[in-house]
Amino acid sequence: MRIGLFAVGRLKSGPEKDLAARYFDRFAKAGPAVGLELTRVAEVAESRASNAETRKREEAAMLLKSLADGSILILLDERGKALDSEAFANLLGSYRDQGKRELTIAIGGADGLDPSLYDRADATLCLGKMTWPHQLVRTLIAEQLYRAVTILSGHPYHRV
């Protein structure tokens, strides 16, 4: 199953970008053994519209336009469902085992996500109830993707 990340906003050079890249690289190397492939990390510029609702609508349109037909869409939102790492790995494994070919994980902009995305989403997850900066969210999801691969492959990286 091909997995992509869609993020509103660009990750600037620095330790967050380096760490995210390290985990995406680990995922890209280990994922194919369990049927998961990193296809892309797409960054789009934040909308310059004058109000939040228009910005969210424009950013949602960019995301929806980039989705492949039939792609699973997982939104990251502080109001989403909290999963532990094993449950997240099992969710990815379940989509893979159902024969799903594409999965996109979306990180919204500073204003959040447009309501239309919740209607389209297959799942809405959170990385905890706290609000995280977008730079850290990207790093956290990169690490969790790598951790999911290690869980699915029985690698000892994930210890309970």
UniProtKB/Swiss-Prot annotation:
One of its GO terms (cellular component) is cytoplasm. It catalyses: pseudouridine(1915) in 23S rRNA + S-adenosyl-L-methionine = N(3)-methylpseudouridine(1915) in 23S rRNA + S-adenosyl-L-homocysteine + H(+). S-adenosyl-L-methionine binds at L76, G108, L127, G128, K129, M130, T131, W132. Its EC number is 2.1.1.177. Coiled coil: none annotated. The keyword Methyltransferase applies. It is found in: Cytoplasm. It comes from Rhizobium johnstonii (strain DSM 114642 / LMG 32736 / 3841). Belongs to the RNA methyltransferase RlmH family. The lineage of its organism: Bacteria, Pseudomonadati, Pseudomonadota, Alphaproteobacteria, Hyphomicrobiales. Pfam families: SPOUT_MTase. This is Ribosomal RNA large subunit methyltransferase H. It is an enzyme of class 2 (transferase). Keywords: Cytoplasm, Methyltransferase, rRNA processing, S-adenosyl-L-methionine, Transferase. The keyword Transport does not apply. It comes from the Bacteria. GO terms for molecular function: rRNA (pseudouridine-N3-)-methyltransferase activity. The gene is rlmH. Specifically methylates the pseudouridine at position 1915 (m3Psi1915) in 23S rRNA. Homodimer.
